[in-house]
Amino acid sequence: MFGLGIIVIAVIIVIALLVLFSFVPVGLWISAIAAGVKVGIGTLVGMRLRRVSPRKVIGPLIKAHKAGLNLTTNQLESHYLAGGNVDRVVDANIAAQRADINLPFERGAAIDLAGRDVLEAVQMSVNPKVIETPFITGVAMNGIEVKAKARITVRANISRLVGGSGEETIIARVGEGIVSTIGSSEHHTQVLENPDNISKTVLSKGLDSGTAFEILSIDIADVDIGKNIGADLQTEQALADKNIAQAKAEERRAMAVASEQEMKARVQEMRAKVVEAESEVPLAMAEALREGNLGVKDYYNLKNVEADTGMRNAINKRTEQNEDESPK
């Protein structure tokens, strides 16, 4: 019985130790003590109860202690609970300390929570980044299109990382400055001869205000000539004027044709009236003969005049037909 009790007690002790080691990261606690970081078992148990991974807090704390940073467990745990990347912020603080950059932990944590890569920002502060723009097109005063590509050397401004705009704003502002500088040039050869004038003009405008970067230099990498926009516009204007003139000429021709048809209709109307009047002549002549107002001699003279008039009209029509059929 005594031996059985010892076995039961031993099993209970083993189970208790297993539960303890599974709930309390004793290995991590030993590592912290060995590194000179004072962390109590109660602190680790409290992290477990607050659903904080002790390894993601104590590991960066050991790293910060070895680097000489004065950080506390509460600072790292608070940043972890806020959804931040504790390890990255600590690495950024270590890199900033090595580069003699003033970066308090609170500012680094705020930058990390804002969605910025704080470690990359510190590295960019030490090693400036080169941003290359696509070809930016502008038109000089003489109508020649000029294309320019620029390389922008920027350094991260840690004090403006929270709330400052990014690379897209830098590229857009530099592009606007290049277009404005090219457009103010009287001749495109001025841009080709002195491309550094673009850099000086754009750099003097303070384009990095309100951004998360500080522009160190703007270098024109390539300049190319595009289309003759002025000539193209003149050609298009001439073509438009031609089309307008043709449209007006067609309108005048249509009006002339309509007027001609109207005149022909009026001629036919007048001829109808003449025929109507001629149809009344025999009746009037018969009435005149009955009443003695017209003699037989007068009647035959009138007939001769009508025959003579008909012959002249026939000759005139034949002459007009011959003139129309003759080659021009």
UniProtKB/Swiss-Prot annotation:
Record-annotated membrane-spanning stretches: 1-21, 26-46
Listed InterPro entries: FloA
Intracellular or extracellular location(s): Cell membrane; Membrane raft
Entry membrane topology: Multi-pass membrane protein
GO cellular component term of the entry, any: membrane raft
Pfam families hit by this protein: FloA
Keywords from the named record: Cell membrane, Membrane, Transmembrane, Transmembrane helix
Principal subcellular localisation of the protein: membrane
Subunit-level organization: Homooligomerizes.
NCBIfam families in alphabetical order: PRK13665.1
Task of the protein: Found in functional membrane microdomains (FMM) that may be equivalent to eukaryotic membrane rafts. FMMs are highly dynamic and increase in number as cells age. Flotillins are thought to be important factors in membrane fluidity.
Family: Belongs to the flotillin-like FloA family.
Name of the protein: Flotillin-like protein FloA
